[in-house]
């Protein structure tokens, strides 16, 4: 009998075990689609980014013009740029929903998978930040200036560190050149980390909505979930194309249509929408170092999730107290996102401070307490 190549070839065997014969819980919902959607986002971003890089010039005197040239003179350059810029937004929508799913269903108890995932989020944020600087518009320049300046809050080495990152005494040509190099490199780092993420995931297998072991009831990934994933791809790519074609500048900042000018500060410096919640937390503390620490903590707190899990149940499916807290946390992050886009004046300052306080309180204090209470109520 001839060997089945798919199951015996050294390379095809890896693909087979990851995408075809992978034993998968029979009851995972649409919330489990976002991992594969993130993979599609990454591929889309690398392809469109590569095409854009072919027409881009990483020089302060030419960057803005080269982007305008891409949009005006390159065949479908406008479409490639719009897909790339809005693709970043979809990437973040998917990753935030993916993390929300992980929090709700207790997926963070796969500790290695979760920790690699948080590192992936940090790498994605770094990639998006350096990419936003490349068109060299007003918000690109001032965003780069403000955010890199935060490192100067680090005691003793801060100022040296910032000047080392800038390659000079202000954001200038060396900064743009190195940001382009980093923006080209980091997506491939993300691709590598994604493989590590999947390797750890396939050690334990997927979690499921009930949060109980599903070894007794697994089904093959293909055709069941491959078809389900293709539906997700179609819906997401249709949404991305619709946004890129009908309203490409909806999520961008009009300030970025003005070339960078170090002598004129925009009235409101703010990052893209996907960083606004962290930006609001940064601004809510009236101290530079304190703000920077809070900003870092807002993401790094995710590393603590496995340690803060006190419930005897994995998922929140049967835990109403934790469910209420979870949805309050979601609302809270949306409020922070809104506050981050507003000017620094009352009542936005106090709302931002209260929202920042409740963000950390819910995660660090109320979630663990709710878990203990639910155990007691159920006599677990």
UniProtKB/Swiss-Prot annotation:
GO terms for biological process: mitochondrial electron transport, ubiquinol to cytochrome c. Pfam families: Cytochrom_B_C, Cytochrome_B. It is found in: Mitochondrion inner membrane. The chain crosses the membrane at residues 34-54, 78-99, 114-134, 179-199, 227-247, 289-309, 321-341, 348-368. Heme b b562 binds at residues 84, 183. Belongs to the cytochrome b family. The cytochrome bc1 complex contains 11 subunits: 3 respiratory subunits (MT-CYB, CYC1 and UQCRFS1), 2 core proteins (UQCRC1 and UQCRC2) and 6 low-molecular weight proteins (UQCRH/QCR6, UQCRB/QCR7, UQCRQ/QCR8, UQCR10/QCR9, UQCR11/QCR10 and a cleavage product of UQCRFS1). This cytochrome bc1 complex then forms a dimer. Keywords: Electron transport, Heme, Iron, Membrane, Metal-binding, Mitochondrion, Mitochondrion inner membrane, Respiratory chain, Transmembrane, Transmembrane helix, Transport, Ubiquinone. Component of the ubiquinol-cytochrome c reductase complex (complex III or cytochrome b-c1 complex) that is part of the mitochondrial respiratory chain. The b-c1 complex mediates electron transfer from ubiquinol to cytochrome c. Contributes to the generation of a proton gradient across the mitochondrial membrane that is then used for ATP synthesis. One of its GO terms (molecular function) is metal ion binding. This is Cytochrome b. It is a multi-pass membrane protein. Binds 2 heme b groups non-covalently. Gene3D superfamilies: Cytochrome Bc1 Complex, Chain C. Heme 1 (or BL or b562) is low-potential and absorbs at about 562 nm, and heme 2 (or BH or b566) is high-potential and absorbs at about 566 nm. Its cofactor is heme b. Heme b b566 binds at residues 98, 197. PANTHER family: CYTOCHROME B. GO terms for cellular component: mitochondrial inner membrane; respiratory chain complex III. A ubiquinone binds at residue 202.
């Amino acid at each position: 009998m001839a060997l089945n190549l798919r199951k015996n070839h050294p390379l095809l065997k890896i693909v087979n075990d990851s995408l075809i014969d992978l034993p998968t819980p029979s009851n995972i919902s649409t919330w489990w689609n976002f991992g594969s959607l993130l993979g599609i986002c990454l591929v889309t971003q690398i392809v469109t980014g590569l095409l854009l890089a072919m027409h881009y010039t990483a020089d302060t005197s030419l960057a803005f013009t080269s982007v305008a040239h891409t949009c005006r003179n390159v065949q479908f350059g406008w479409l490639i740029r719009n897909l790339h810029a809005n693709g970043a937004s979809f990437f973040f929508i998917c990753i935030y929903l993916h993390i929300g799913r992980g929090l709700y269903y207790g997926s963070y108890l796969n500790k290695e998978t979760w920790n690699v995932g948080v590192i992936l989020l940090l790498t994605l944020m770094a990639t998006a930040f350096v990419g936003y600087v490349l068109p060299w518009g007003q918000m690109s320049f001032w965003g780069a200036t403000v955010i890199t300046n935060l490192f100067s809050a680090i005691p003793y080495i801060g100022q040296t560190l910032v000047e080392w990152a800038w390659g000079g005494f202000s954001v200038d040509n060396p900064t743009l050149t190195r940001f382009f190099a980093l923006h080209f490199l980091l997506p491939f780092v993300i691709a590598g980390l994604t493989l590590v993420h999947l390797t750890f995931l396939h050690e334990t297998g997927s979690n499921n909505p009930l949060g109980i072991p599903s070894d007794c009831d697994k089904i093959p990934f293909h055709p069941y979930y491959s078809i389900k994933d293709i539906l997700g791809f179609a819906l997401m790519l249709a949404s991305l194309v619709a946004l890129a074609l009908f309203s490409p500048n909806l999520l961008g900042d009009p300030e970025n249509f003005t070339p960078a000018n170090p002598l004129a500060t925009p009235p409101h410096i703010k990052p893209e929408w996907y960083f606004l919640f962290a930006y609001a937390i940064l601004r809510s503390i009236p101290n530079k170092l304190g703000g920077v620490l809070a900003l870092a903590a807002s993401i790094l707190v995710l590393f603590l999730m496995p340690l803060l899990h006190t419930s005897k149940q994995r998922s929140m499916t049967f835990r109403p107290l934790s469910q209420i807290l979870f949805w309050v946390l979601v609302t809270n992050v949306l409020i922070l996102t809104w506050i981050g886009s507003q000017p620094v004046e009352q009542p936005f300052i106090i709302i931002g401070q209260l929202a920042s306080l409740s963000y950390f309180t819910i995660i660090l204090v109320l979630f663990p307490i709710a878990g203990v209470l639910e155990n007691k109520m159920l006599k677990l």
